[in-house]
């Protein structure tokens, strides 16, 4: 949860979750 994936998750889930990103504070992060 430290590397921003350049995607927000305010209205929809992280599409980048397929590469390991998850929602945190309305922004998608990985690791």
From Swiss-Prot:
Tissue-level expression: Expressed in fruit, pedicel, root and stem but not in leaf (at protein level).
Post-translational events: This is a cyclic peptide.
Disulphide-bonded residues: 5-21, 9-23, 14-28
GO biological process, one term: defense response
Pfam families associated with the record: Cyclotide (PF03784)
Note on domains (UniProt): The presence of a 'disulfide through disulfide knot' structurally defines this protein as a knottin.
Job description of the protein: Probably participates in a plant defense mechanism.
Family in the record: Belongs to the cyclotide family. Bracelet subfamily.
Protein name: Chassatide C6
